[in-house]
Amino acid sequence: MGLALILVINPGSTSTKVAVFRDKEPVFTETLRHSTEELSKYKRIIDQFEFRTQAILDMLKEKGISLSQIDAIVGRGGLLKPIESGTYIVNEKMLEDLKKAERGEHASNLGAIIAYTLAKEHNIPAYIVDPVVVDELEDVARITGLPEIEKQSIFHALNQKAIARRLASDLGKRYDEVNLIIAHLGGGISVGAHRKGRVIDVNDALNGEGPFSPERAGGLPVLDLVKLCYSGKYTFEEMKKKLIGKGGIVAHLGTNDVREVYKMIENGDKNAELILDAMAYQTAKEIGSMAVVLKGKVDAIGITGGIAHNEDFVRRIRERVEFIAPVYVYPGEDEMLALAEGAYRVLTGEENPKTYS
């Protein structure tokens, strides 16, 4: 086929990112910002559908792009039921689940709905790629010490998978031929064991497992946490916020920005140095535990996410884990490219689209 034009739609809480790719090369990327005032009119996230769709159409018109030129539309996948990794065709069942939002209200739920609506009018395919609910855990990885609590797979699937594919390619191999450990360092930190193309274990980076991060508490001594819950000082919502949003570095140092922490260290703040080092230490420890999951057969370790831009922080992790396997660094995250690549693999026949059921 000739060059494919792919429209990418990635709704976030206060913005919608839109891009057009020609094959895997970006033609443009735009961030449409939505004020709190604009969004406060809508009771549920699903109610923002028409408002956001219109904003996208207006922007495409400004850019002189007609939907009739587009070969496929790909949206950010939302909170669906657990599914295996891949590129999925948006179907009625998926739309129904996203509209019900039984697994949670999140702006990413709109990605598939908007993509489908625009694609339907022009008879082109709509896809989603590797949503956060990707679940390829082995049964043994789900078990905890309490039968009422099962471990869940919630992680930065889109970026982890995209970086794992890139790393495999840099090794001259296919993703399903290698064993990798990928650490995503962002507002949350997720470390995944990728065995031959499947993430067979990963810490639940959202709900309090693994390393603490700039704004999440990570794994904690359980009984001390229970005591805190019953201290009478906090409501359920306050405790939740303490763990997710106000935990980790922000709880210790009052900022969730690692660059600010480095300024504190430069000014001689010994406590800031210790906290930062502890975050690197816990991340390295999690990488070590994933090496055990892979029985020591690790081809490479990939470090990605916003914090990977910081060479000193990467060094702190690297010096603890490079005995396991070579360490490759891919700073930042490019969700738009990862989504476009997912659609591209299907359009070129490299991968078959999956069906959500």
From Swiss-Prot:
Principal cellular location given in the protein's record: cytoplasm
Keyword ATP-binding: yes
Pfam families, per database record: Acetate_kinase
Catalytic activity: butanoate + ATP = butanoyl phosphate + ADP
Keyword set includes Nucleotide-binding: yes
Keyword annotations: ATP-binding, Cytoplasm, Kinase, Nucleotide-binding, Transferase
An MF annotation (GO) of this entry: butyrate kinase activity
SUPFAM superfamilies reported in the protein's UniProt record: Actin-like ATPase domain
Compartments it resides in: Cytoplasm
GO BP of this protein: acetate metabolic process
CDD domains cross-referenced by the UniProt entry: ASKHA_NBD_BK
GO cellular component: cytoplasm
Family statement: Belongs to the acetokinase family.
Protein name: Probable butyrate kinase 1
Organism of derivation: Caldanaerobacter subterraneus subsp. tengcongensis (strain DSM 15242 / JCM 11007 / NBRC 100824 / MB4)
